[in-house]
Amino acid sequence: MRIELEKATKLDRIRADYNVHYWSQGFYGIDDQGEVYVSPRSDRAHQIPFSAIVNELEAQQLNLPVLVRFPQIVHQRVHGICHAFNQAIEEYQYPNKYLLVYPIKVNQQREVVDEILASQAQLETKQLGLEAGSKPELLAVLALAQQGSSVIVCNGYKDREYVRLALIGEKLGHKVFIVLEKLSELDLVLEEAKSLGVKPRLGLRIRLASQGAGKWQASGGEKSKFGLSASQVLSVIERLKREGSLDAMQLVHFHLGSQMANIRDVRNGVNESARFYCELRALGANIEYFDVGGGLAVDYDGTRSQSSNSMNYGLAEYARNIVNTVGDVCQQYEQPMPVIISESGRSLTAHHAVLISNVIGTETYQPEEVHELGVDAPLLLQNMWRNWENLQDGTDARALIEIYNDTQSDLAEVHSQFATGVLNLEQRAWAEQLSLRIYFELSRKMSTKNRFHRPILDELSERLADKFFVNFSLFQSLPDAWGIDQVFPVLPLSGLGDAEERRAVMLDITCDSDGAIDHYVDGQGIESTLPVPAWSKDKPYLMGFFLVGAYQEILGDMHNLFGDTHSAVVNVDEHGQFEISYINEGDSVEDMMRYVHIDVDAIRDNYKQLVSQRVEANEQAQILAELEQGLAGYTYLEDF
């Protein structure tokens, strides 16, 4: 009984270390066996271990890495956002409705868009629309949107073809809003609407003075890339009045930026934009839709804070602030309350996808005995040994800092003297081993309670951490972790009862020093290393990278010609049985070569020529077969 209690206490501590309960929204967790599970159904009745899913993937001959999608999570996110706004509308007696518009730029994968639309297929009154920000996206949306879909919103810069396609969407039965980003677009819309005989639905993107904080703050404010200034807005209204087309202006739109962490910034932006709405209504524009754009954040680190990786509000608070603010401003200026639209793509899709891969090797530090050099050893090395002896004899907190600083300085001097030929290779190796031994002992003797020790302990943790080489490309699968230091939850998928054994950093398999994850969710903060169970080459070691369903796939690049990973769609039935409903195989080596315009047929001819010239006749068929197999194979490592 005592052992079970200790195990439960340890697992609770580990759950807190990974902060899973808070960033996962209940979709993921750690069970009592230390296994990470997914619970994608709305009733949360069933917990499916990821190890079982991986076993099934392997049974279907799918090698890691694999991106696993859970469409039931997408459905729940749609329902959750719509429910939050519907509740707020009821609470504040707001006399209009809410529409959720999905910007497909967040994740254009067909299975993702289909599931978003399917989430309300059984509802009589649907609250879903789609947004396009380019011609290719618009052409996709025109086909994917349900007939009579609530809305299609067209954002982004537009040429004549883009405008014509949007207007053609009206002929196809869609309700298409063309949002003006710059003044010149108005001429195009009016000309092509007349040419096609279509009455356009226009929107205005307002360039607000309000601005959020964080990585995407440049999306808002007076210097933002998109939107019309107050004077430009008035120019549009005057032009439409002259054309007798003011009734075409039906929507006002703004965008403060993605991942808005502070609800106050959201409220300020909505308030300013609602003032624009009321002023435009007073000028005669029959605007009926109020589009707050994106910004609904994802709590990647689970801290519920104003960090750029978090959010200090929930869905209900977000919806209440928007509905209440719009309602108050409209009431104050005696204007009708519009249909509220949000473009909440990140919040819709982030949670549904998990990248699973395997650790293919590690580099670890194990304390080794270091022997004293002879009396004729260089003075520099003798000083290092003296520090080691002082550390073993026991020292006060201040002396520990001095030993650390001295060791840092001495090791730098060792490297300098080796470069100039004063020290030889054996002496350099001895100094490096001794410094690691000193760092290890310092990490055990220093205390996090001492504020002067904390930054040193962070540095020592990085120095002594295990290096886990994971079979994936950071640039392909987690580009935001590299490009903007986005934090994604990362954790081993099994054996977490022993997760306090080691600390590690995750490195990818690209030939690039940037291919490393630098930040990890750890309790209520971010650390530079991750607590993990010790790695063993005798059994598979699986890592999960969570909340990767927004932006990562489409932003991923092909560094070192690592291509798209395999992906699999997993559903769970009411009995707790899971099924791999769909598999999309990742890129082969040949696929990637063709993408960069390498003539694969010429490659094959070159192989044949080289083999015929250099390889014994009895080996030629086997060598050619292996080369051909390599071209057809997965771009990631397969023999681990």
Swiss-Prot record:
This is Biosynthetic arginine decarboxylase. Its cofactor is Mg(2+); pyridoxal 5'-phosphate. Its EC number is 4.1.1.19. Substrate binds at residues 290-300. The modification N6-(pyridoxal phosphate)lysine is found at residue 105. Belongs to the Orn/Lys/Arg decarboxylase class-II family. SpeA subfamily. It comes from the Bacteria. The keyword Transmembrane does not apply. It comes from Vibrio parahaemolyticus serotype O3:K6 (strain RIMD 2210633).
